[in-house]
């Protein structure tokens, strides 16, 4: 990976861990927090979206791009809702690592199916990252058994991980179509920001429509009540994934970007201990070592 791409992903990890702390603080809001945060990002980026479409031309973008965008938006919503609901049942330090690291192996496998190659050391790095994330939720090494992961919180974290896997692979393919279509007019960085904005709209519109159709207007009211904290999280969410999307334009294999993003697990753990007074255990320390070792192995041959 390019050194600039690595720097962008690492900085995005700091922001990602930060908005997860805000999400934990408002875990009881569930879908409302996710909706409010996503909508704030939509409104922030809408003027840019209009400028981009006027500059590039609506008809320039292929229909396949819009189809991938819709699917990616739904996958993002699955991830966000799964994550926030999981926080109702467990610590940030438990849920965050599982939801973020499990997709490493999943995206790696999908990348292979799409024709990308991975070295043995990179696969070993993926395994270490995944093992590290499995250790982090435990309070003791004797708990490293299947029973420790059979609970509602981890189940929702798995749902979030599936969402992450989906949008990570789809976004890379959609970005490729977008940059090819707009490449003669605007550079890749402009297209990455545009994709970020339209993706947020693809996330939030289905949820708002669902609330209206089902008569669940309480979620809309709750979203309004927590708009200040959610807006801050929305800005962080937009900044976080915008940096990742830009990094994706600099590398062919999205699995490397996904693996590097797991440094946010370490940051999330530290923030959970510092800001939310969550406990630190030896297992979490061991998990952090495995995660960092896995990242080094993954990038060593990248």
Segments predicted by a language model, with ranges:
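Extracytoplasmic gate region of multi-pass secondary transporters
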Residues: 167-176, 249
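Membrane-interface interhelical linkers
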Residues: 1-14, 18-23, 28-71, 80-90, ...
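Hydrophobic transmembrane alpha-helices of multi-pass small-molecule transport proteins
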Residues: 45, 108-109, 121-140, 283-302
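Hydrophobic/small/kink-forming positions within alpha-helical transmembrane segments
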Residues: 13-17, 46, 73-81, 101-109, ...
């Amino acid at each position: 990976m390019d050194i600039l791409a690595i720097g962008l992903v690492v900085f995005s990890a700091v922001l990602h861990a930060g908005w997860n702390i805000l999400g934990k603080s408002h875990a009881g809001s569930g879908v409302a927090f996710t909706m409010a945060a996503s909508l704030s990002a939509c409104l922030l980026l809408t003027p840019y979206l209009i400028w981009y479409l006027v500059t590039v031309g609506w008809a320039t973008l292929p229909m396949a791009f819009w189809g991938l965008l819709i699917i990616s938006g739904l996958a993002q919503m699955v991830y966000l809702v799964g994550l926030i609901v999981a926080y109702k049942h467990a610590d940030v330090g438990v849920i965050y690592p599982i939801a973020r690291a499990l997709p490493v192996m999943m995206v790696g496998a999908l990348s292979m199916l799409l024709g990308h190659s991975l070295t043995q050391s990179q696969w070993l790095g993926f395994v270490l990252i995944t093992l590290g994330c499995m250790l982090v939720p435990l309070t003791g090494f004797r708990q490293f058994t299947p029973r420790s992961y059979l609970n509602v919180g981890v189940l929702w974290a798995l749902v979030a991980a599936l969402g992450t896997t989906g949008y990570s692979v789809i976004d890379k393919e959609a970005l490729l179509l977008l940059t090819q279509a707009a490449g003669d007019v605007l550079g890749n960085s402009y297209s990455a920001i545009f994709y970020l904005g339209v993706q947020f709209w693809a996330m939030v519109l289905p949820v708002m429509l669902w609330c209206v159709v089902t008569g669940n207007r309480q979620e809309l009211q709750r979203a309004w009540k927590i708009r200040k904290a959610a807006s801050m999280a929305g800005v962080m969410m937009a900044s976080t994934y915008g940096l990742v999307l830009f990094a994706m334009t600099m590398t062919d294999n999205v699995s490397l970007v996904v693996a590097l993003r797991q440094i946010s697990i370490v940051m999330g753990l530290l923030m959970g201990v510092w800001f939310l007074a969550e406990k630190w255990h030896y297992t979490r320390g061991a998990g952090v070592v495995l995660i960092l070792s896995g990242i080094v192995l993954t990038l060593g041959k990248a």
